[in-house]
Amino acid sequence: MAPKINKIVNGPIPDSFLADETKRLDSLKFDGQRLEVLDQLLLPHEFKYIPVNDVSDAFNVIKSMQVRGAPLIAVVGSLGLLLEFNKNSELNIETIREKIEYLITSRPTAVDLRNSVTGLIPILETEGITDDEKLAKCQEYLLNVYTAEKLQNRILLWNAYQELLTAFPGKEKFTVMTICNTGSLATVSWGTALGVIRALHSENRLNLAYVLETRPYNQGIRLTATELLHGQVPFKLITDSMAAWAMKNHQLDCVLVGADNVARNGDTANKIGTYMLAVLCKHHNINFYPVVPFTTINKNISSGEEIKIEERAASELLRVNGVLVGNSECPVWNPAFDVTPAHLITKILTDFGNWSPAALEEQIPR
């Protein structure tokens, strides 16, 4: 799905922008034939890449959260399908449909995965071409999911960076806050919200980033802190419950978050705790920005009421690194995501331009 306007804000993008690739971690390794993904459950203590050979492997690493982040799981799901096609050249449309639906169930809230793999269906339904031609087109499409994510991510980060410069004219350095992990470990490039923080740092415009630990899966302390330490980016780690006090006492300029699903009206589903930050931003008069690829915007739903929220196992809340930290009989509610209403959002920053939620829907093709 492409918007009506393809806009690079204040372009062209200089070659120097985020040019130093050694400053970021690699979430996967892919040479066209073999795929290995970084097992993020082992971070920060061990860096281990594990093979993904087919759809079943892709499902397992996504479901278990060995890989996570909306853009990354879309790529891993797509490459899993590609490797499946490479192993088995027999094109059975019903079997492929089943594999697509199977992949989607691995993380049902994440619309990027759904959008990416269901993009095969129009190809499969094309009339007047042979099965071999359909297979070739499917393989080309799935590979493009991977290559396009890299290209569009750079545009996304440039657009978001330019929005901050425009929203805060004359400001030399920014103090920001983020939740979860939205960096290179959530994408195949620099990231979304955390990528903007990396861009600010690379341009010498970052004062400090406050990073929420992000319970119960601890993506902030395990993943985001690991990325920022690797890139020598100034940050402070805080617990989720410290966010309000940090906003009151440390003159934040904005909160930058990612998203797994954005409705047509701008309602935004993201990691649990994001809604809390948006409410706090409203109270403290702080700008609140989801930073998302346009593929995360779901043209099929009108509001956040239609977003399915994944609920995960009680053990994820009761255990840390496998160690039981509470009574195993505790009743638990563990939603993985929440939905931030559009009226709490300053702008949604995308690779096709930056819009207020009210203006966003006008850009979405029907």
Swiss-Prot record:
GO MF: S-methyl-5-thioribose-1-phosphate isomerase activity
Principal place of residence: cytoplasm
First-level EC class: isomerase
Annotated positions for site Transition state stabilizer: 180
Active-site residues from the entry: 260 (proton donor)
GO annotation (BP), single: L-methionine salvage from methylthioadenosine
Keyword Cytoplasm: yes
GO cellular component, as recorded: cytoplasm; nucleus
Keyword annotations: Amino-acid biosynthesis, Cytoplasm, Isomerase, Methionine biosynthesis, Nucleus
Cross-referenced Pfam families: IF-2B
Superkingdom: Eukaryota
Cellular localization per UniProt: Cytoplasm; Nucleus
Pathway note: Amino-acid biosynthesis; L-methionine biosynthesis via salvage pathway; L-methionine from S-methyl-5-thio-alpha-D-ribose 1-phosphate: step 1/6
Function statement: Catalyzes the interconversion of methylthioribose-1-phosphate (MTR-1-P) into methylthioribulose-1-phosphate (MTRu-1-P).
NCBIfam families referenced in this protein's UniProt entry, alphabetically: eIF-2B_rel (TIGR00524), PRK05720.1 (NF004326), salvage_mtnA (TIGR00512)
Homology family: Belongs to the eIF-2B alpha/beta/delta subunits family. MtnA subfamily.
Name of the protein this chain belongs to: Methylthioribose-1-phosphate isomerase
Organism from which the protein derives: Caenorhabditis briggsae
